[in-house]
């Protein structure tokens, strides 16, 4: 190896000045082409990463979570319809039909956009079991119309079992499949982005190093202190290195903001929203099916604990007040606590605190419903449960949903902005990079041609 290097060094020293200048020119052109390839390849990789996270995977996950929401809310409205005499709760009937149409459309859209093998069977399960559930609910409605309470309860229990044990788990599985795929893709794309930036920097340094070496050679061998063309080529290479590095780093940062800051909050907020829908359904089931009232009450409390658990001696008001000041409350856990402990964007804290406060109002009304039911005031409990007027349960739940939606909208806007900015960061490189590389190559040629002409003359 040492002998080979020695021979190569000896061969180089035997080269004439024109040969060295031509060699430097060709090496500079080669390094320019390498920079062109590294930059375009890196830009395309960065753009693919942003598209995969922002346009492909994330919407699929949100769609799966919205399927969960619609299923849970549809069933809650079915229970609300059954709590009163036929025709007395048109709001519940309307909401049920809207959710039915929505969930059918979303499952159909998911079937048209299958990306992973696991999705195929999950979507088939959703399609088949949803049809069975809707048929069963229609049977329940028929029994309800005839005033057959036993038929209503027996068949509704079967429908509820389909929702709880098949449909909701299938929707959750669809969400999980897409979420894991997104996590894998994100990790892979981040690594690829780091490699791309590394190659761009290395190829840039190689090109800049060659240009500097040529100028030093001219200064030493030919007593030419300054070569304006080579200086311009070097300046362009340095500026382009700074510009491209900034663009790659900014695109990587915006991808991180979209995935880790905004989208993970969106996922948690939507998961919490889905749990809240299911808890709201348990509240109605508690009144609808007295035989299993304790079971439905415990299911409600379990879901509430997933959403929010307050430390001993604290209330929703005290925790909300502390959270509004940015204080972390020890012992405060659940999805709402996680959101309040992960505030990133302007207005997010205020919206999250409002969500917590509104949920506290809803829970207070739920306690009143159970107190009325346990006091034998079944009709009053139902009226409070299905009522949409201020001070009634459905009104309070709607207030909670609106506050939750505002928090979601803030994170969604941040996600969309980060994705849009990520695309802007790497926009136009397919045009600017060839222009820059061509300019460097041409300036190098123009800078060396007079020196080469001196020897050819």
Regions found by a protein language model. Give the residues of each.
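Polytopic transmembrane helical bundles with strong interfacial aromatic enrichment
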Residues: 28-33, 37-40, 367, 436, ...
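Extracellular/periplasmic juxtamembrane segments that couple receptor/chemosensory ectodomains to their
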Residues: 264-266, 270-271, 386-414
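Membrane-proximal N-terminal soluble sensing/regulatory segments of transmembrane proteins
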Residues: 49-125, 151, 258-354, 385
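Amphipathic alpha-helical segments and their boundaries
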Residues: 36-71, 193-197, 237-276, 425-429
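Polar/charged, Q/E/K-enriched amphipathic alpha-helical segments with strong coiled-coil propensity
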Residues: 117-191, 333-401, 419
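N-terminal membrane-targeting/anchoring modules of bacterial envelope and secretion proteins
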Residues: 1-23, 31-34, 38-64, 68-77, ...
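Juxtamembrane interface at the cytosolic side of transmembrane helices
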Residues: 2-22, 42, 194-251, 434-457
